[in-house]
Amino acid sequence: MSLDLPHPIVLGRSGLPGSDGLIDLTDYDARQHGVSRRHCILERRDPYLVVIDLGSTNGTYLNGDRLAPQQAVPVSSGDRLILGTLHMMITFHERASHQ
């Protein structure tokens, strides 16, 4: 999955199509992996990208460390993010310049 982050986004699951600001992980078996409806937020806090756990039931982990709820933690390219038991790898890509 590829994301552009002009504003904060929530990672989670929803039964409602088009939930504002929510990246719905249902297609990745989110419920079976213990992903909460509003699990965590990814947002830019220049010069960083941060992840914030939203008090999820099954936890948010960054590189194996469980995040405390409501604490912003910087994320780097190559980091492993786990929501419940759903594993992801964070990779940054340069934007193509349009000339």
Task: Describe the predicted segments one by one.
Residues 11, 44, 55, 61-99:
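C-terminal boundary/linker segments immediately following FHA domains
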